[in-house]
């Protein structure tokens, strides 16, 4: 599935950056963003339901379609957050952990929800880590969001989550197009780096801050621990790389040349 990027939505529909972050990159739904109830209904009727109820079922054998939808909804709601498969099983109250894992794989292959693994030098630890779920388009997240666009803008904590999820959505799509792995990092002290891009042994560290970059200990801890492999690192936000510049980055070039 192809999603429109920031500059395309801006040029075609006059989207502001804030509108792109919240409503995502579905050109067919752009005319409805000023009527959010209608926009959400259109998201469900013209995007989500056709994909889950028809497109995926045409190409995959899904024994429990309601569970597939529940996993998708959880992935959307928890976009840019960690959640264990065991916890997901408890929330949906059905299915097995292997089934949920297989449905996440299908949602990843169809560019809906990506389960990010935690970066580790050990491939086994990476594979067995608690995933950080990432919607491929922030429109999925906000189809289920309890905050309207204006409410999200006014809520500092919520808007921070919106921005992080939008950045992750862009990176998830570029990972497929540009051929790199998208991961995250957290250590036993709960130091965290929001996104880690990996190509071969080369790493790029990205931290997302929608406001003041005042809590970036995890970002620095990651760079210190994996200094030999990091070829680029930067903060996305008002005190780092502006969102307008981030969304037009040539990411493959960052594995070759420092952004600094």
Where are the predicted features?
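Conserved small helical "lid"/interfacial subdomain of P-loop NTPases
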Residues: 3-16
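Accessory nucleic acid-recognition modules appended to NTPase machines
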Residues: 36-202
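Arginine/glycine-rich "motif VI" loop of SF2 helicases in the C-terminal RecA-like domain
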Residues: 174-177, 222-231
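Amphipathic alpha-helical "lid/sensor" segments that cap RecA-like P-loop NTPase cores
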Residues: 13-49
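Active-site-adjacent loop/helix micro-motif of nuclease/hydrolase catalytic cores
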Residues: 212-221
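Active-site ExK catalytic segment of metal-dependent nucleases
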Residues: 202-213
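Short, hydrophobic beta-strand segments that form beta-sheet elements in well-ordered domains
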Residues: 231-237
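Domain-level recognition of nuclease-like catalytic cores that cleave nucleotide substrates
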Residues: 238-260
């Amino acid at each position: 599935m192809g999603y429109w990027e920031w500059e395309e939505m801006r040029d075609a529909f006059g989207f502001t950056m804030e509108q792109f972050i919240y409503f995502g990159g579905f050109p067919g739904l752009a005319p409805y963003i000023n009527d959010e109830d209608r926009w959400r209904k259109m998201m469900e009727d013209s995007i989500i339901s056709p994909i889950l109820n028809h497109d995926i079922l045409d190409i995959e054998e899904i024994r429990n379609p309601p569970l597939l939808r529940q996993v998708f909804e959880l992935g959307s709601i928890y976009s840019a957050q960690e959640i264990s498969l065991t916890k997901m099983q408890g929330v949906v109250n059905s299915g097995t952990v292997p089934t949920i894992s297989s449905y996440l794989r299908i949602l990843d292959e169809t560019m809906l929800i990506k389960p990010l693994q935690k970066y580790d030098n050990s491939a086994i630890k990476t594979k067995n880590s608690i995933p950080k779920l990432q919607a491929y388009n922030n429109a999925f997240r906000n189809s289920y969001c309890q905050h309207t666009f204006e409410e999200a803008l006014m809520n500092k904590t919520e808007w921070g989550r919106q921005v992080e999820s939008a950045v992750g959505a862009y990176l998830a799509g570029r990972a497929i197009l540009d051929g790199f792995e998208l991961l995250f990092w957290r250590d036993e002290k709960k130091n965290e780096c929001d996104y880690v891009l990996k190509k071969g042994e080369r790493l790029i560290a990205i931290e997302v801050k929608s406001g003041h970059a005042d809590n970036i200990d995890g970002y620095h801890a990651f760079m210190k621990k994996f200094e030999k492999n990091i070829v680029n690192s930067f903060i996305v936000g008002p005190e780092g790389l502006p969102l307008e510049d981030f969304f037009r980055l040539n990411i493959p070039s960052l594995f070759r040349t420092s952004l600094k």
